[in-house]
Amino acid sequence: MAVSWRSWLANEGVKHLCLFIWLSMNVLLFWKTFLLYNQGPEYHYLHQMLGLGLCLSRASASVLNLNCSLILLPMCRTLLAYLRGSQKVPSRRTRRLLDKSRTFHITCGVTICIFSGVHVAAHLVNALNFSVNYSEDFVELNAARYRDEDPRKLLFTTVPGLTGVCMVVVLFLMITASTYAIRVSNYDIFWYTHNLFFVFYMLLTLHVSGGLLKYQTNLDTHPPGCISLNRTSSQNISLPEYFSEHFHEPFPEGFSKPEEFTQNTFVKICMEEPRFQANFPQTWLWISGPLCLYCAERLYRYIRSNKPVTIISVISHPSDVMEIRMVKENFKARPGQYITLHCPSVSALENHPFTLTMCPTETKATFGVHLKIVGDWTERFRDLLLPPSSQDSEILPFIQSRNYPKLYIDGPFGSPFEESLNYEVSLCVAGGIGVTPFASILNTLLDDWKPYKLRRLYFIWVCRDIQSFRWFADLLCMLHNKFWQENRPDYVNIQLYLSQTDGIQKIIGEKYHALNSRLFIGRPRWKLLFDEIAKYNRGKTVGVFCCGPNSLSKTLHKLSNQINSYGTRFEYNKESFS
């Protein structure tokens, strides 16, 4: 099927434009710095000593400076949530670009890893060249103390060398702990190692303070490559006759007077010895702004989250899912947002993100989250909240005398699903536990749907286990009945796809009778579904929202970009829970 350029531009255009701008900045900065150290007269003698290693080390350092500053901006999540919710970003296309913050953070991280490798390799060559090409003429320019000094001493006895080695170790730990396998199997390792970025930035500011690389300051009196008369006489070097010949005044008419340091048209004579000075550290100029912004946000988030919530109830659902309902004074959130949970009794430092499945409203202050019990943290958290005897039961009623552990929340933070209520037509597709981001949206519609732009919602939930359906079966039934009573049966189109057939009638036949006709066995036929939605919403823009496995996401993303004969445009939005 052909790609719709209209849909492609809506889904990919701004993203690729920003990627092009970012790439251009990196290429321009790399090339400009490379040329400066390769051809700049102030680095003439240093380039003679170090060669290509100097150019590559400095060019890669400039790219590292840029990306070490940019990588912090996507992590200012409170700022991004404010921009999304305020009128500062009125364009929906621009707001959707904020959803790529995590991808941009990863892209900058990968770039830092690649150019760190280039930077390290170039400086290893520089350390060798400092030793081999020790300059007897310009001793001030040397980093080595004598010719053929062991290059390893430069790596482990100088500030730039030692901090560089430490940064490589920190970066290696952060890279390996950021892989998908470790994030899923042991999130604790990812969390602890990622917080080493504070150490990384401290080392980075120290790294540039060593002053090993120097530039020439007196280019006007000592042009690079000039001949020093003092050096030639002290070394018993005689200049050729035409070198020692002086111009006589007055100069012939039509000829300009040569520069003071010029003796003839063939050679320039130095007026003084070259003077060198260490480069002014520029890294702090790059990172100070974003780092201060991030630290200010972390401080604000710490103050905002230092008061524990009040747990109202804990509900145990089938398939290892737990629901927590709580209240907190002055807490406000929008449907689709998420929060982070911090329980000191489980871990003193760990915070874990969970999508809000119930948001506070004007009439009720209760909000809640659903947790899938996967990993050490959620298992320990469940054991604290639920006694072993009640973990298999459906509901644990709230008991006033029960002592729950202290629980702190941070947020709310923005997500792509906030836009689902801003389309006239939205298609929400969930895979398994990926249904949680849509629960708050469904709860909001159940409370009051009229203030929002949304007029038709297609809700598709693909699940392997019939027990998982019970997480939100009551909510779906109430929503279905509400719109039938208000004579709006076409407002919400619910389709549930389950692969397990055993016991379906037993579980949903009586209690959830309204959903019987909404239940299908197998997987959705996505192409037919998109064609049907396009047909019934001709010429409209449909927001597509997906939270589930990557295979599901890729399928919907591809279909959203394909052309259709009804003039319908699909704008794709994705949330990942891994």
Curated annotation (Swiss-Prot):
Record-annotated Ferric oxidoreductase domain positions: 58-303
An annotated Gene Ontology molecular function: NADPH oxidase H202-forming activity
Region spans: E-loop: 218-273
Broad class of enzyme this protein falls into: oxidoreductase
Cytoplasmic side: 1-16, 84-103, 176-188, 446-578
Bilayer topology term: Multi-pass membrane protein
Protein name, UniProt field: NADPH oxidase 4
Gene name, Swiss-Prot/TrEMBL: NOX4
